[in-house]
Amino acid sequence: MAVCEASAADCLYRSAVAKTGNLVNVTGDLQTIMAGLACGEGNMIGWDILKNHVDVFASCPDWMSAKATRIYANPLGDDPHVVSGESGSVPLGFCFTALHDEDAKRLKKKR
């Protein structure tokens, strides 16, 4: 399972990287097109579950979400048209980048 967050408010990602088991809050300018993800503070109950079960915590820039929003809106072949805002598109943007970006090759390694 992957948790994808806006890089401007990536509290869960920073908490995972810190490896202390505690939540790290993000403050300051939380400006992002992913408005629904711009809170900067995690929930302790959720964090207690996520920190032990998530495979990847991803800090995602706005372009990743914008690209996925366009992919959803312009499906290929028989794929369905999906209407999604930027907060809902970011997981697809992360997956697309992991599969197609040479710099993200390490994300494809199997455990």
Predicted regions and their residues:
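PLP-dependent amino-acid enzyme catalytic core
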Residues: 1-111
